[in-house]
């Protein structure tokens, strides 16, 4: 029985206990899938699970928990369960209200990498077959090696078949082919440069930010969208100018608000229309948090995030003597 059939079978067993279930469905577009909201058995057949399911459906958890009176089911990849764990650690919804259906993952494909490889050609169909991705454009057909086009997070994933939290787990017979690489390799390359070059690099990135708020809206941990500083008029924090200063202000505020909370799902970078490498910022924040507080977001929902706790003495932070 295929992974999709087993998923449908499991959902069929529990759907009566749920008011709504969020899963993946065909989008009608190559390389992409859509979220689907299922309320009865008639729509279960629309569920899919494949290498194009890159979206983190945990982004719907908080809003649905507020809006829906009954129980909620969410189909998640093992890495996505970290976002749920983090939300629970901040006591943002009742654990008993959420049914987590974790599906073992064999890696998901980054469609931006594929589009870059094909130099922007219009893709009209795509299909993952064994270790190959068959892509058809208007003029040509291509066979690409799947292992070369995984999302960056897949290369250092160590929980793809071992979700840290779930109610139902559907094991995937296909395993992730690549060995976890060096998680911080891109940061090390950037940080090997001098401070002036690093500053110049980020200025060049931030000036492209058009503040479409896609990064904020897709993030499962950015739950204060209706109270975001970008929408406040009194006080007025953010102007509508498009330049490196305003882009820097918005993105660094995001980093601060997500410090010790980001589970590094990469959704912010995935949806950015300007391809700003936002994951680098978030990984750096996570790296510092782990070093100072020995804490990794999304690992244990019983452990409070460092910025929601207070200690008289932090063993990894030395106080500066004031002269």
Placement of each model-derived feature along the sequence:
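Helix N-cap / loop-to-helix initiation motif
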Residues: 77-80, 215, 277-278
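Ferredoxin-type iron-sulfur electron-transfer modules in oxidoreductases and energy-metabolism complexes
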Residues: 178-207, 221-323
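Short gly/pro-enriched beta-turn/loop segments at secondary-structure junctions
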Residues: 149, 200-204, 210-214
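Iron-sulfur-associated redox domains of electron-transfer enzymes in respiratory
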Residues: 1-200
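Active-site-adjacent beta-strand anchor residues
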Residues: 74-77, 209, 271
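Generic secondary-structure signature for well-ordered alpha-helical cores
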Residues: 16, 159-162, 211-214, 267, ...
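C-type cytochrome heme c attachment motif
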Residues: 152-156, 211-217, 261-271
């Amino acid at each position: 029985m295929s992974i999709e059939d087993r998923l449908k079978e499991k959902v069929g067993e529990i759907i009566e206990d749920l008011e709504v279930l969020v899963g993946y469905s065909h989008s009608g577009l190559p390389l992409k899938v859509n979220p689907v909201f299922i309320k009865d058995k008639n729509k279960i057949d629309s569920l899919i699970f494949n290498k194009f399911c890159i979206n983190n459906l945990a982004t719907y958890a908080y809003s649905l928990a507020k809006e829906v009176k009954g129980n909620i089911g969410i189909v998640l990849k093992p890495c996505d369960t970290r976002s749920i764990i983090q939300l629970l650690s901040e006591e943002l919804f009742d654990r008993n209200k959420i049914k987590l259906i974790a599906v073992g993952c064999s890696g998901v494909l980054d469609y931006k990498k594929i589009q870059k490889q094909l130099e922007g050609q219009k893709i009209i169909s795509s299909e993952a077959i064994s270790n190959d991705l068959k892509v058809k454009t208007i003029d040509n057909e291509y066979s690409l090696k799947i292992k070369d086009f995984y999302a960056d997070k897949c290369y250092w994933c160590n929980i793809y078949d071992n979700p840290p939290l779930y109610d139902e787990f559907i094991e995937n017979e296909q395993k992730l082919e690549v060995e976890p690489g060096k998680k911080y390799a891109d940061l090390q390359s950037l940080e090997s440069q001098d401070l002036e070059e690093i500053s110049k690099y980020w200025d060049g990135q931030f000036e492209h930010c058009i503040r479409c708020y896609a990064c904020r809206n897709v993030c499962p941990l950015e739950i204060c969208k209706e109270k975001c500083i970008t929408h406040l008029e009194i006080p007025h924090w953010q102007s509508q100018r498009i330049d490196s200063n305003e882009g820097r202000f918005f993105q660094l505020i995001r980093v601060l608000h997500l410090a010790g909370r980001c589970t590094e799902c990469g959704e912010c970078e995935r949806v950015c229309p300007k391809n700003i490498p936002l994951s680098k910022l978030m990984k750096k924040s996570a790296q510092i948090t782990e070093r100072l507080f020995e804490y990794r977001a999304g690992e244990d929902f019983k452990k409070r995030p460092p910025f929601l706790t207070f200690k008289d003495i932090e063993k990894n932070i030395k106080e500066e003597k004031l002269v």
